[in-house]
Design a protein with these regions (language model features):
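Bacterial N-terminal signal peptides
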Residues: 7-21
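A catalytic-pocket lid/entrance helix-loop region that shapes and gates access to the active site
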Residues: 30, 292, 317, 321-389, ...
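Accessory cap/linker subdomain of secreted extracellular hydrolases
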Residues: 139-196, 200, 204-209, 266, ...
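N-terminal cap/lid segment of alpha/beta-hydrolase-fold proteins
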Residues: 201-244, 616, 620-622, 680
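Cap/lid segment of the alpha/beta-hydrolase catalytic domain
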Residues: 238-306, 488-497, 653-655, 664-667, ...
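C-terminal, loop-rich substrate-recognition/catalytic regions characterized by aromatic stacking residues
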Residues: 396-397, 485, 492-757
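Short beta-strand/loop motif that positions the catalytic acidic residue
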Residues: 439, 445-447
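Active-site-adjacent alpha-helix of alpha/beta-hydrolase-fold enzymes
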Residues: 455-473
Length: 757
């Protein structure tokens, strides 16, 4: 798998071996008075003296750890030849013991050690020696291995310097150092010395390496409709295309600088990275996002299929907007399109500008940043736009009067507000209904439990399988958010420590899938069924034939008031005697203008919100698996004709911590819960039942002793529409339509169902 360089630079620049602790002579103390700064010219000599004293006495019962530490000590002591021999012995041991080749950072260090040895033995400059070692290593690597190693070799040295400084700070005002901290310092120094020495040398060598391996066309103008062109970068693997034709991986993006067109080429494909017209030349831009992309993609696919280097097969990939373009192209069924793989694909009308039919003000910011007026000087920071939201919210004006700025973005946003239902305006850009059954190609969708993009990702997946139960469409979902859905879960994020098995590289998994879909390789162990999910807390990837199969077994919990002021209950049985709970919310109140939900995934306390009620189970006596979508029936009486509801699930651990099972919360407009195409208003003052199914998937193992907690409330936030419940178009409502506070009486027929395979 590819190293997670862009996600975890600090991991790459840590010591050569993690947790490399000696088991012998740990009590040894060494006199040591280092300079206080990692960049002090006197530090190398001080560390060399320290290393020279440790090498003769250092032993460790763990031979792998011993060899790794010994190599760092030998390099620091100025003996690269001995360090080279230690690295060779370590590599042989890893291959014989674990059956694996050295990791990327170990190869980088081996190149550095070889260069220092050549410098000493042949009396040449380090730059010359490094070039020799670099070329000798890279000439034996295939394109993919070379691409992987490039990510490691470009790691910055500054975090390494910080690691050295941290170790020095621990020795402040001390005159002796124990063996363990001495090894920590030596390893940190060895890494810093290596990377800082090669930092200025690697880029010219990598450029030459790319020229040797790839044919690159930086600015290709591909003709599309209306006399316009799509700007594309095309990278082809030189060896493969000189020997024959290859399949192509096409990706549309809003910013070519944010993507590496060489990535697909390293996997053996012709790589075409195309700039969506909405982000291209002003004269050729369509009037709004989404409008031309499907037809443009079809034209680009047809063009690719006619090129002499193309074997006629095109796979599409993309994240966010690029994922939308792939699906918009699939709607048009171009013959050469053979597979699509997307991560958090956008779906206009589903997750932008609204989710759960509730329009989000962030959609306006997104349009504005894409279509800024000439000479725009609007601050591009969260605080500015947050103030924008709060000023509108406090004003009580209708959403139609949201304070947009001059320019085309305002026109687009207001036009979108005219279509609150998922009607033909939105349907025209994507497969709809039975059109999904015509998408008869392999599809992969990647998303995360903590990603806002999960809403659209699950929409594509469920609709495709709904209209074609035999669709070749796989879902890969784990504890990822918007930032990590491509790069994988880090060791910790937002207060949460993901399971070890979740720390995969979804990007590498996507190319493994392409090798299966386009190349006929065996399917990967990770993506071996239609639903592939990491059960957080269980440290295990699981697989199911469908969401329906996964959700076949459900556990029902009734929402019940608890006597005596204790927490409301999620009860396994419905009470015989009728009961109810009443929630109220003053829609005129604006004291909450600054409130936003915490992005932390583990909370010490849940936020107290007017109109929100908490329900919890008894502690579970054994671990409980929860995997699938939350569903249920809300049995209630309300004094309004509509309401926006919000639901959230937590695990309340015996430690008192609340762990989110998904994020963001599931918010939805009640009048669209049954049908996103047609609005069905509520009946004020009448008891009614509202079935619902969350657009969020859960994959979590509740610990023994934990409780399941449901937060059920009324959605009212400064950064989205406010539904005042009058029954009018919500964008037309203002605070004048609020009238009496919302009053919902939750009857004891309300229940949720938890899928528990």
């Amino acid at each position: 798998m590819r190293p997670l360089l862009t996600t975890f630079p600090s991991l790459i620049v840590l010591a050569l071996v993690l947790a490399a602790r000696p088991t012998v002579a740990a009590a040894q103390e060494f006199g040591f008075d280092p300079p206080p700064s990692a960049t002090d010219p006197a530090l190398p000599a001080a560390l060399r003296d320290l290393a020279e004293r440790i090498v003769p006495i250092y032993t460790d019962d763990d031979s792998t750890r011993y060899l790794a530490n010994l190599a760092a000590l030998q390099m620091t002591a100025g003996d690269p030849a001995a360090a080279h021999e230690s690295r060779i012995a370590l590599d042989k041991r890893l291959q014989s013991k674990e059956g694996r080749s050295p990791a990327g950072r170990a190869i980088v260090y081996a190149i550095y050690v070889q260069a220092r040895m050549t410098e000493a033995e042949e009396h040449v400059s380090f730059a010359s020696a490094f070039r020799q070692a670099f070329r000798a290593t890279f000439e034996h690597l295939d394109d993919l291995a070379a691409d992987d190693l490039e990510a490691w070799i470009l790691a910055p040295s500054e975090p390494l310097r910080e690691a050295v400084q941290h170790e020095l700070d621990l020795q402040h005002d001390k005159h002796e150092i124990a063996l363990e901290p001495a090894l920590d310092l030596v390893r940190a120094w060895a890494s810093f010395e290596a990377y800082s020495s090669i930092e200025s040398l690697v880029r010219p060598l990598l450029t030459a390496e790319k020229e040797r391996r790839y044919i690159v066309d930086e600015e290709v103008a591909i003709p599309v409709a209306d006399g316009a062109t799509i700007a594309a970068t095309i990278v082809r693997p030189r060896a493969a295309t000189e020997n024959g034709k290859v399949a192509t991986v096409l990706e549309f993006t809003l910013d070519r600088s944010s993507r590496d067109a060489r990535e697909a080429a390293a996997h053996g494909y012709a790589s075409v990275l195309a700039l969506a017209r909405i982000a291209g030349e002003l004269a050729a831009r369509p009037r709004a996002p989404f409008e031309s992309d499907g037809d443009d993609a079809r034209a680009v696919i047809d063009w690719i299929a006619q090129q002499p280097w193309s074997d006629g097969r095109v796979g599409m990939q993309g994240t966010g907007y690029g994922g939308f373009v792939a699906w918009s192209a699939a709607k048009r069924l171009p013959p050469a399109l053979k597979a699509i793989a997307t991560s958090d694909p956008m779906a206009p009308g589903i997750d932008i500008p609204m989710r759960g039919r509730i329009v989000l003000s962030s959609a306006y910011r997104w349009i504005y940043e894409m279509l800024p007026p000439p000479g725009d000087a609007t601050p591009n920071d969260a605080a500015h736009w947050r103030k924008f939201d709060e000023e509108w919210y406090r004003s009580g004006r209708s959403y139609r009067e949201f304070p947009t700025l001059p320019g085309p973005a305002s026109v687009v946003f207001r036009r979108w507000l005219n279509y609150p239902s998922y009607d033909r305006f939105w349907q025209k850009w994507l497969p709809f209904g039975a059109e999904f059954a015509k998408v008869d190609i392999p599809v992969l969708t990647v998303t995360g439990y903590y990603s806002a993009g999960q809403t659209a990702a699950l929409y594509y997946f469920t609709e495709h399988h709904k209209y074609d139960p035999n669709a070749n469409h796989a879902l890969l979902i784990g504890p990822f958010d918007e930032q990590t859905v491509e790069k994988g879960a880090p060791p910790s994020a937002r207060g949460w420590i993901p399971d070890e098995v979740a720390r995969i590289d979804p990007n590498a998994a996507r190319y493994e899938w392409f090798a299966h879909a386009l190349g006929g390789d065996e399917s990967s162990e990770l993506i071996r069924d239609n639903v592939n999910y990491e059960l957080t807390g269980a440290n295990e990837w699981r697989h199911a034939a469908s969401l329906g199969a996964l959700e076949q077994k459900r556990t029902r919990f009734y929402l019940q008031a608890s006597p005596g002021g204790t927490a409301n209950a999620l009860a396994a049985k419905k009470r015989k005697s009728p009961s109810s709970l009443t929630a109220t919310l003053n829609l005129r109140d604006r004291k909450d203008a600054a409130w936003r939900p915490s992005r932390e995934l583990v909370l010490d306390v849940l936020p107290a919100r007017d109109g929100t009620m908490l329900f919890m189970t008894e502690p579970f006596s054994a671990p409980v698996d929860v995997a699938g979508r939350l569903s249920g029936v809300l049995d209630f009486t309300i004094n309004k004709q509509d309401v926006d509801l919000v639901l959230m699930l937590y695990e309340l651990r015996s430690s008192g911590e609340y762990v989110k099972l998904f994020d963001p919360a599931y918010a939805f407009r009640a009048s669209y819960a049954k049908d996103r195409v047609h609005r069905h208003l509520l009946v004020a003052g009448v008891r009614q039942q509202l079935p619902f199914q969350s657009e969020k998937m859960v994959g979590h193992q509740l610990q023994a002793g934990s409780r399941l907690v449901l937060a059920l409330g009324i959605n009212k936030r400064a950064d989205s529409q406010v539904n005042y419940g009058s029954g009018k178009d919500v964008s037309e409502e203002s605070i004048a339509d609020a009238h009496a506070p919302v009053r919902i009486r939750w009857h004891d027929g309300s229940f949720i169902e938890i899928p528990s395979p």
